[in-house]
Amino acid sequence: MNLNATLFAQMVVFLVLAWFTMKFVWPPLINALDERSKKIADGLAAAEKGKAELDAAHKRVDQELAQARNDGQQRIADAEKRAQAVAEEIKANAQAEAARIVAQAKAEAEQQIVKAREALRGEVASLAVKGAEQILKREVDQTAHAQLLNQLKAEL
């Protein structure tokens, strides 16, 4: 094997190149690769975090929708109950008003009956006096006539 000086020179140049590369080129490459892997890891973590937040947001939205539906149904049920209560109150008021009108009509009818009886008593008393006067063929004076009418009214 023939070793000559060019081989040693090539080895020295290679070692200088290796040292230069290790000293000046290799650290920025390692830093760039580390930064890149860190950015990728941060991006993946952010994506995972975003996905988790999205899932949480979906759950919150679903819960709020369910709550809104429940609230809506509750409000509808409350409105129906209030409407039914108002209808019952109106019905009760109408029945009370009808009973009051019937009672008033009965009272008016009773008053008319009493007035009619008084009028009939007066007429009957007057007819009785006239009949008695005609039977007795004598005239009764006005004061005696009024007293007789009052007595007959009281008796009837």
Swiss-Prot record:
Gene Ontology CC terms: plasma membrane; proton-transporting ATP synthase complex
Subunit and partners: F-type ATPases have 2 components, F(1) - the catalytic core - and F(0) - the membrane proton channel. F(1) has five subunits: alpha(3), beta(3), gamma(1), delta(1), epsilon(1). F(0) has three main subunits: a(1), b(2) and c(10-14). The alpha and beta chains form an alternating ring which encloses part of the gamma chain. F(1) is attached to F(0) by a central stalk formed by the gamma and epsilon chains, while a peripheral stalk is formed by the delta and b chains.
Pfam family, one: ATP-synt_B
Membrane topology qualifier: Single-pass membrane protein
Name of the protein: ATP synthase subunit b
Gene: atpF
Subcellular locations according to the entry: Cell inner membrane
UniProt cross-references to PANTHER family, sorted A to Z: ATP SYNTHASE SUBUNIT B, ATP SYNTHASE SUBUNIT B', CHLOROPLASTIC
Function: F(1)F(0) ATP synthase produces ATP from ADP in the presence of a proton or sodium gradient. F-type ATPases consist of two structural domains, F(1) containing the extramembraneous catalytic core and F(0) containing the membrane proton channel, linked together by a central stalk and a peripheral stalk. During catalysis, ATP synthesis in the catalytic domain of F(1) is coupled via a rotary mechanism of the central stalk subunits to proton translocation. Component of the F(0) channel, it forms part of the peripheral stalk, linking F(1) to F(0).
Similarity field: Belongs to the ATPase B chain family.
Organism: Burkholderia ambifaria (strain MC40-6)
Residue intervals passing through the bilayer: 7-29
UniProt GO MF annotations: proton-transporting ATP synthase activity, rotational mechanism; proton-transporting ATPase activity, rotational mechanism
UniProt cross-references to NCBIfam families, sorted A to Z: ATP_synt_b (TIGR01144), PRK05759.1-2 (NF004411)
Upper classification of the organism: Bacteria, Pseudomonadati, Pseudomonadota, Betaproteobacteria, Burkholderiales
UniProt KW keywords: ATP synthesis, Cell inner membrane, Cell membrane, CF(0), Hydrogen ion transport, Ion transport, Membrane, Transmembrane, Transmembrane helix, Transport
